[in-house]
Amino acid sequence: MTMQLGLALVLGVAMCLGCGQPLLRAPERPFCVLWNVPSARCKARFGVHLPLEALGITANHGQRFHGQNITIFYKSQLGLYPYFGPRGTAHNGGIPQAVSLDHHLARAAYQIHRSLRPGFTGLAVLDWEEWCPLWAGNWGRRQAYQAASCAWAQRVYPNLDPQEQLCKARAGFEEAARALMEDTLRLGRMLRPHGLWGFYHYPACGNGWHGTASNYTGHCHAAALARNTQLYWLWAASSALFPSIYLPPGLPPAYHQAFVRYRLEEAFRVALVGHPHPLPVLAYARLTHRNSGRFLSQDELVQTIGVSAALGASGVVLWGDLSFSSSEEECWHLRGYLVGTLGPYVINVTRAAMACSHQRCHGHGRCAWQDPGQLKVFLHLHPGGSPGAWESFSCRCYWGWAGPTCQEPRPELGPEEAT
């Protein structure tokens, strides 16, 4: 599938930021694609310009990895996140119970003030992947956190029998983990209230690929769904959701759409928890495949970015590491992919989402598939730039609007109530 887009389309791409309104809450932006790749060195060190703005991709100033449009906080960059290193070394006590919540929040507040301007309106993504805040979610290598919690309970409650110590270990871990995650989000939202705060990879889905094609459906695992229901407090404390739609290595192309669809549908399900209006859902997607380093093909962009737009997501965040700007050759390689494949598709999808919004939703909502089970029609412009037929799409109204086509003003559903 080839997108034939003229210069007029490139020049006509609207920016995600405008009029000082928070990112993604400006009513004219039904779908955004954001750049979370540390590519500043391409221009600064090698003189290779990446025309992200012209291609409809929102990036930080100077294409820095951290900035006012998007900032991701890794485990050592916000507060005192406890975890075990690869060799078992405990950092910040290793487990949530060992961390002083007051000290954690004080350090996090200092880092937020230092990293984000007071008027920050972008995405604030917390990447804490070492443990799950629910005891049952810590299996495999994460069982180290259960073992350390049991040892903690034995020290703190030496007179209890082993079963009671296990109960104390579980309760202590879950209570401390919840406090760390919930209060960190609350702190961020208090200090930078116009930003969109949430944790990367949440909600989880458990529909990864394990090499068995005969019974793969793409549905989320029942245990993952149950854990997400238990994490009601996390969704209530968030102001955006950032699920991952990284295509698993070896996943056959026939299953790409189901894999992405069910991950996003689970995010839409929990996005309503604790909020009068659904939280924005922005899926994290990779530029390349994890094992091979091969860039996503046109069809794979359709099954990630295209499916996200057609399901009604607020946007997609494109992630990459320093390898993309490690040399002049890599920078030219990245530029070629941007200009030849990724950029034209992003322009097409974002303009199609805009056209559908205005045609079906009075410009006050985003289009989403009426029946996600019939994923035949995408938000694509035809070659030459003409809009498609949007009969397969219904409207998801922005804050402050309601009705089948988002034509009814509802001031009581304004952003201040919804966040």
From Swiss-Prot:
Highly expressed in bladder, spleen and liver. Expressed at low levels in the kidney. One of its GO terms (molecular function) is hyalurononglucosaminidase activity. Coiled coil: none annotated. Its main location: secreted. The active site is at E129. It is found in: Secreted; Cell membrane; Cytoplasmic vesicle, Secretory vesicle, Acrosome; Endoplasmic reticulum. It catalyses: Random hydrolysis of (1->4)-linkages between N-acetyl-beta-D-glucosamine and D-glucuronate residues in hyaluronate. The keyword Coiled coil does not apply. PROSITE patterns: EGF_1, EGF_2. Facilitates sperm penetration into the layer of cumulus cells surrounding the egg by digesting hyaluronic acid. Involved in induction of the acrosome reaction in the sperm. Involved in follicular atresia, the breakdown of immature ovarian follicles that are not selected to ovulate. Induces ovarian granulosa cell apoptosis, possibly via apoptotic signaling pathway involving CASP8 and CASP3 activation, and poly(ADP-ribose) polymerase (PARP) cleavage. Has no hyaluronidase activity in embryonic fibroblasts in vitro. Has no hyaluronidase activity in granulosa cells in vitro. Belongs to the glycosyl hydrolase 56 family. This is Hyaluronidase-3. It comes from Sus scrofa.
